[in-house]
């Protein structure tokens, strides 16, 4: 049986594509391969990650790379990285989020590598201890890294996302950004700041087709000791000891790999959900606070500490 597959080109000339089923099959296969390669190219997405040398940042870089994403993993000293540098689809760049000039420089280098779809603001650490024992330098350093670093990296990428009317910012917040705990006032302050900032910014960014989300984990196993600074004072030794005991022996501690999976879900679920509370400990405490109210929650924390 004969077949005639034709179309008119832009000059309205009749173009014959195939006259037999064999010709049609050949033409269709060529077309499929062409568009399939284009589809694959377009579906290869890129994530830019800060604080990728350890913990959640590193686990997220590995998780996304294993999912076929291109990953731009940034850290203060990429020359010391011995694992991510072995992955073909991971590029390492230097970035200290407390250095505004380097933020601009690294952003430009990252954008020169190609299209970026997601920026994951993850760099941060915990400053724990009573306020009386914390120095002004420690306060400034905590705010510079946990809050201002996120703000500056976001500012650097907004024009790019705005121009293409697409893109997503994801920030590592904390359950300490929706609930406050003792002996962590400055850490709480940075995470609460991120929560208000993110919610307000979500209205602005939605006007230009850009999204923003926050990940709110509870205790994360790899970061309890590795990314925490302690400031102690003898007058508060009892409270500090009780609280640290709760942290060290707490149930429902989450791994960095589990958080990385939540980040991936946030990046790919196609929703405009703002907050992702994750980890059994965080989910339980947050549900308790919502159900019982602020004052009842505060009382429960005091009761746990025997205060």
Which role fits each region the language model picked out?
Residues 174:
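Residue(s) in the substrate-gating loop at a strand-loop-helix junction
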Residues 154, 190:
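Active-site helix of classical SDR
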Residues 53-54:
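Conserved glycine-rich cofactor-binding loop
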Residues 95-105, 136:
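The beta1-alpha1 cofactor-binding region of Rossmann-like NAD(H)/NADP(H)-dependent oxidoreductases
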Residues 207-273:
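SDR active-site lid
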Residues 130-131, 135-140:
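Substrate-binding pocket helix/loop in short-chain dehydrogenase/reductase
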